Amino acid sequence: MDELTRRVLGMFDEMGRDALDLHELFEAGGNDADARRQVLYAVESLVERGLLEERGNDFYALTVAGREAAAPAQGGEGESL
């Protein structure tokens, strides 16, 4: 799993929330417009892979698989993607 994808998944734990809106997830890319575009692509990929679910109004939540995938960054034993 690439670093940006790990950062996107880690945002949920960092913010201590079950669901985040796209603007909060953009923080994983910082202030650079290209990096934020890459965050958008990462979010779309995570939804397609079943690691995030869309909640409407640009909100996204981790799925069970997403929590497991995020676990290695948090010291757990999640899968390597």
Specify the residue positions occupied by each region the protein language model found:
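Generic alpha-helical secondary structure signal
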Residues: 3-6, 37, 41, 64, ...
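A generic structural-conservation signal
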Residues: 21, 55-56, 79
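Short amphipathic alpha-helical interaction segments
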Residues: 32-48
